[in-house]
Each structure stands twice: as structure tokens, then as C-alpha cells.
């Protein structure tokens, strides 16, 4: 049986056992004159045909046709057992040489597949580093180039919210000020109505005084007419008396002197004139007092009315300015809302485009993961086949080394666990059991 050269070694550990390709001690080796360079031939006088048949069937079942990364290989082994002289005859030597060549070719292909797998891993890492800079694994994602835009958008949204809150605060303050001015206006309006009612009452009093004055003037005119009438009657009576005296006989009698009518009339006239003067003075004094009071109240009411009118004008101007400012703030608010809506729609479209690119990248990553999983499964299968072959080679080495000694063969159990992983999640676990005959002394 020919094995690998002693220049290269390969160690695979499983269940606490290690297998090396350089398995034969240096003292038990004999160099082959017809083998491949770097190979070893071990000759034995006799090997049981059952062992050779078992090894042939094991190789046939352990090396199926497979493809990996575009390279295909096939392995099929057949032996014709001829008894104890299989390894001693020419056909036995050729069969062992063919087996050695096939095993060396298989191990070379395994090494090449391992190298290609390593190259694929490097390419995948390079692809991740190019597509997503600064990452080393499929789960890492870098959104660093979008952080500045997102931060700017967040700052703009926060500024718009602050401006909106400020505008709403100004609007609330303006509403409160308008309500305050409205209350003041209503109070001043009620005061104005009260003053106007007082002015109307004073006007009625003034009209009553004017009517009383007119009535007094009419009474004075009536008294004057009556006085003139009395004077006229007195003159007529005097003329009639004087004319009657001239046409009659004057008879003088000693009698008591009579009252002088003119004096009585003069006294009556003086009394009436004094009474009229007193009434006129009292009426004028009362009228002047009332007129002065009315003028004072009218002046005060006029001043109050003027001050209230000026305050009302100021309030109207303030209300107009506040309404203008309110309209300006509402227009600014609508403009900011439209700008914010446009900005949100624009950046929403950009975020959708970026999300679509991210989805494409994730699909590509999923495909790469599936390919890697498939390659990993094939690699695990080939590794398991290699371990089986190395275990059987070790068994045959022990059998060949103990050709001159007798011992018992003990079956060792080797368990191989195969896990199916998808995105780092274990879907299923399969345990393969292999019985290896080992010679014990």
C-alpha cells in the first residue's frame, strides 16, 4: 500500500483522534523504484483477500462523482482478488500503484479545493469591503454616508418644529392681547354709552330750562302788556275825569281827603316791578347755575369722549396691526409647511431608492450565503471522505506493520457530525457512525 510523501503532512481532528498522512515510521519504509516521486511502498508477503475487497468497496462508496467550483472529479476503484499473492504478484503491484495514484490525485484535488475555498472566502471579503466599506462580515452594514443627510434632515425638522411652536406661541399671545383689547373696548363702549346717556339727560334738562325761560319770558311779556293796558285805562280814566270836571259845577265839600290813585298805581307798579326783577334775577341765577353745571358736565363728557375716542382709535390700529401680523405668520406657517412637505417627500424618495439598493445588496448577500453553504456542505462531505480514507489507511498500516505478529482486531467507533447551517442557524444535525478495525496486542 502506497501513501503520501513524507514531505507534506495533514492533520484532521475528530473525537479526540488525529490522523497524519506521514504514518509509517522511517525504519519500516522501503523506497519504490516504480512509484511516483515522494511515495512509499510497503510490501508484505500476504494480505487477506477479504481486507482488499473491503477496502475496494469502501473506496467505491466513499469517492462518488462530485463537482465543486466548476471542477469535477470521479473516483472508482475495482479489485480482483486472487488470494494471498495479490500484493506479491505483478497485477497486485499494479493495483496498489493505481490505488496509490488515485489516492494521491484525490488528496491533491482536496488541497486544490481547499485553496479555491480560501480564495472564494477572500473574494467574498473583498466584495464586502468594496460594496460596504469598513465591514468585514455579511451582517455588517454601513450607513455612514447617509448619517450626515439624515442629521441635516433631523435638524431641519427640529428647526421647523421650533419655528412652528414659536409661531403658535405668538398666535396665542396675539389672541390673548386681542381678547384683552376686546374687553377694554367693551368696557370703554359701556362707559361711552353711560356718558352719552348722561349727555342726553343733560340735554333734556337744558331743553326744560329753555322751555322754563320761554315761559318766564311769556309771563313777563304778559305782565308788561297788562301794565300797559292798566296805564292806558288810567290815562283814559284821567282824561274822562278831567273832561267831566270841566262841564260841571264845582262843589266843594269839607270831606276827608281821598286816596291818591296814581300813587297807589305807582306803588303797585313798583311792587310788581320789584317782584318781577326779583323773579327775573332768581330765574337768571338758577339758569346760570344750571347752565354752568351742564356746561361743566358737557365739557367733562366731551373730554372723556375725546379720550375714549382716541383710545378706541389706538385699539383699532393695534387690532389691525395684530391682524396683519397674524396673516403674515399664517402665510409663513403655510409656506414652511409646504416646504417641509416637499422636503419630506424628496428625502422619502431618496430613502426609498437607498432602501431598494440595500434590498438588492441583501439579495446578493443571500445568494452568496447560499453558495457558501452549498460549498461548505460539499467541502464537509469531501472532508468526511478524506477522514474515512485516512482512518482506513491507518488501519491497513497497522495490519501491515503487524504482519509477523498476532493479535486481536478491535473495532473503534468514529462519529462524524454534519450540521446544516443557513444564515448562521443550525437547521439539522446528522451523526454518521463508522466502525474501524484496529489491531490490538
From Swiss-Prot:
Q: Where is this region: Linker 12?
A: 242-261
Key word Coiled coil present: yes
Let me know which tissues express this protein, per UniProt. Expressed in skin.
> Keyword set for this entry?
Coiled coil, Intermediate filament, Keratin
An example of a Gene Ontology cellular component annotation for this protein is: intermediate filament
The protein's matches in Pfam families, at most eight in alphabetical order, are given as:
Filament
Query: Annotated region Coil 1A: where?
Result: 92-127
Q: Which domain of life is it from?
A: Eukaryota
Could you tell me which residues belong to the region Tail? 404-441
Q: Where is this region: Linker 1?
A: 128-149
Q: Where is this region: Coil 2?
A: 262-403
Head, as annotated region: 2-91
Q: Which GO terms describe its molecular function?
A: structural molecule activity
Q: Does the keyword Metal-binding apply?
A: no
Region ranges (Coil 1B): 150-241
Subunit structure, as described in the record = Heterotetramer of two type I and two type II keratins.
Recorded protein name is Keratin, type I cytoskeletal 15
- The organism encoding this protein is Protopterus aethiopicus
Amino acid at each position: 500500500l502506497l501513501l503520501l510523501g513524507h514531505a507534506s503532512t495533514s492533520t484532521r481532528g475528530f473525537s479526540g483522534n488525529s490522523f497524519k498522512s506521514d504514518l509509517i515510521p522511517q525504519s519500516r519504509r522501503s523506497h519504490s523504484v516504480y512509484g511516483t516521486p515522494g511515495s512509499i511502498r510497503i510490501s508484505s508477503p500476504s494480505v487477506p483477500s477479504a481486507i482488499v475487497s473491503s477496502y475496494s468497496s469502501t473506496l467505491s462508496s466513499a469517492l462518488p462523482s462530485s463537482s465543486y467550483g466548476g471542477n469535477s472529479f470521479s473516483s472508482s476503484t475495482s479489485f480482483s482478488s486472487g488470494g494471498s499473492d495479490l500484493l506479491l504478484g505483478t497485477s497486485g503491484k499494479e493495483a496498489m500503484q493505481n490505488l496509490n495514484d488515485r489516492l494521491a490525485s484525490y488528496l491533491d484535488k482536496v488541497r486544490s479545493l481547499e485553496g479555491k475555498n480560501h480564495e472564494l472566502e477572500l473574494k467574498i471579503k473583498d466584495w464586502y469591503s468594496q460594496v460596504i466599506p469598513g465591514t468585514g462580515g455579511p451582517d455588517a452594514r454601513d450607513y455612514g454616508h447617509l448619517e450626515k443627510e439624515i442629521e441635516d434632515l433631523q435638524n431641519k425638522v427640529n428647526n421647523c418644529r421650533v419655528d412652528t411652536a414659536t409661531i403658535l406661541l405668538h398666535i396665542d399671545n396675539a389672541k390673548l392681547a386681542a381678547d384683552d383689547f376686546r374687553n377694554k373696548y367693551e368696557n370703554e363702549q359701556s362707559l361711552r354709552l353711560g356718558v352719552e346717556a348722561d349727555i342726553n339727560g343733560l340735554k333734556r334738562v337744558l331743553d326744560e330750562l329753555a322751555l322754563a325761560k320761554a315761559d318766564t319770558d311769556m309771563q313777563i311779556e304778559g305782565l308788561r302788556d297788562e301794565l300797559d293796558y292798566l296805564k292806558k285805562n288810567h290815562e283814559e280814566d284821567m282824561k274822562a275825569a278831567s273832561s267831566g270836571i270841566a262841564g260841571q259845577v264845582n262843589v266843594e265839600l269839607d270831606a276827608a281827603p281821598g286816596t291818591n290813585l296814581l300813587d297807589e298805581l305807582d306803588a303797585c307798579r313798583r311792587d310788581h316791578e320789584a317782584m318781577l326783577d326779583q323773579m327775573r334775577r332768581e330765574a337768571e341765577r338758577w339758569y346760570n347755575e344750571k347752565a354752568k353745571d351742564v356746561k361743566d358736565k358737557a365739557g367733562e363728557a366731551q373730554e372723556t369722549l375725546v379720550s375714549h375716542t382716541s383710545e378706541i382709535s389706538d385699539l383699532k390700529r393695534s387690532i389691525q396691526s395684530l391682524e396683519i401680523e397674524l396673516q403674515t405668520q399664517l402665510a409663513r406657517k403655510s409656506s414652511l409647511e409646504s416646504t417641509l412637505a416637499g422636503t419630506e417627500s424628496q428625502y422619502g424618495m431618496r430613502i426609498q431608492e437607498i432602501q431598494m439598493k440595500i434590498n438588492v445588496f441583501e439579495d446578493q448577500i443571500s445568494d452568496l450565503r447560499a453558495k457558501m453553504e452549498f460549498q461548505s456542505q460539499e467541502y464537509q462531505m469531501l472532508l468526511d471522505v478524506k477522514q474515512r480514507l485516512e482512518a482506513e489507511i491507518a488501519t491497513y498500516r497497522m495490519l501491515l506493520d503487524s504482519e509477523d505478529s498476532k493479535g486481536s482486531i478491535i473495532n473503534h467507533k468514529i462519529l462524524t457530525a454534519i450540521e446544516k447551517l443557513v444564515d448562521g442557524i443550525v437547521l439539522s444535525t446528522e451523526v454518521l457512525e463508522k466502525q474501524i478495525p484496529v489491531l490490538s496486542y
